[in-house]
Regions:
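A contiguous binding-surface segment within folded domains or other stable secondary-structure elements
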Residues: 151-214
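Divalent metal-coordination and catalytic microenvironments
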Residues: 18, 30, 68, 80, ...
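Conserved beta-strand hairpin/beta-sheet module of binuclear metal-dependent hydrolase folds
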Residues: 1-60, 149-165
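Active-site environment of divalent metal-dependent phosphoester hydrolases
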Residues: 11, 35-36, 69-74, 95-99, ...
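Core dinuclear metal-dependent hydrolase active-site scaffold
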Residues: 2-6, 17, 124-158, 198
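Active-site HxH/HxHxD metal-binding segment of metal-dependent hydrolases
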Residues: 33-133, 157-161, 231
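Active-site neighborhood of phospho(di)ester-bond hydrolases with catalytic His/Asp-centered motifs
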Residues: 29, 61-69, 88-92, 138-141, ...
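Accessory terminal helices/loops
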Residues: 1-2, 184, 191-204, 208-293
Length: 293
């Protein structure tokens, strides 16, 4: 098992490429589509970097995995699928998110049965990538549909585990994901994080985002479970649930909405597909007013 991480500095999002070296098959986790909201311009620099890597290594893409419907960047999953193949994977509870935002955006024709995605996962779902086993973990809290993916590699004789955690836990000096989106829950997030922290201390957690403190360190893509248990500023080992929930809810009240939440969510709940062109050939995003506090 090899994992290569690509950072989009604009949204501070990591796209990870999981590779089974024996079979040369791979999966891409949380791919980013570049979007300039002021100009209404999309571009593919991040996606092309990942595509170029996959091609240069002679890899076959099996899966494009979304850990959840992101609110901070648009997904490039359809673009990558068109270039490399692969199936788009999402947690089955995305249907709840679709139903909520279909109303907010007043989308008449948005299917809310998650049928836009190729593979739907739930707790315990298994994906096979060569000699690697990918197990889905339902980790609600940030949204009701969040999934983490635990990868197990037994090919070297000793079991090796890595987990793509999505928006659950961040670097130790950053803490945890917000829970104030529709159907988010600090109580659920605490329970989800405890499941991750119950893994062996040497398990590598692959982060979806990193937000280094100003004037501090470089971005990091991975953290060991043991380090999280010792140092996470929100939820280190021994943090009571009530204390975490109180902190998380109070902190969320101070946070502004992500700057790309409205463009991102309407695209990402539709498996990354952009709106269809109108009769003038132009695609348009919708911006509902006063719908998110």
């Amino acid at each position: 098992m090899n994992i290569h991480s690509f950072l989009d500095k604009d949204t501070e999002t990591f796209t990870h490429v999981l590779v089974d070296e024996a079979s040369k098959h791979c999966a891409i986790i949380d791919p980013v589509l570049d979007f300039d909201p002021a100009a209404g311009k999309i571009s593919y620099d991040n996606a092309n970097n990942v595509i170029g890597f996959v091609k240069s290594q002679g890899l076959t893409l099996d899966y494009i995995i979304e850990t959840h419907a992101h609110a901070d960047h648009l997904s490039s999953a359809p673009y990558i699928k068109a270039q490399l193949g692969g199936k788009i994977v999402m947690g089955k509870y995305i249907d709840k998110v679709q139903k909520t935002f279909k109303t907010i955006f007043n989308f008449d024709d948005l299917a809310t049965d998650a049928s836009q995605f190729d593979i739907l996962t739930e707790e315990g779902s298994e994906l096979t990538l060569g000699d690697l086993s990918i197990t889905a973990m339902h980790v609600p809290g940030h949204t009701p549909a969040d999934m983490a993916y635990k990868v197990t590699d037994k090919s070297a004789g000793k079991e090796k585990i890595a987990v793509f955690v999505g928006d659950t836990i961040f670097a130790p000096d950053v803490g945890s994901a917000r829970c104030d989106f529709p159907h988010g829950s600090a109580e659920d997030l605490y329970d989800s994080i405890q499941r991750l922290l119950a893994l062996p201390d040497d398990t590598l957690l692959y982060l979806c985002h990193d937000y280094p403190p100003k004037g501090g360190r470089e971005h990091i893509a991975t953290v060991h479970v043991g380090e999280q248990k010792l140092r996470n500023i929100h939820v280190k080992q021994g943090t009571p649930k009530a204390e975490f929930v109180r902190m998380r809810n109070q902190r969320d009240k101070t946070l502004a909405m992500p700057r790309l939440i409205l463009p991102s969510v309407q695209v990402n709940i539709n498996a990354g597909e952009l709106p269809k062109p109108e009769d003038n050939g132009v695609r348009y995003l919708k911006i509902p007013l006063n719908q998110l506090s």
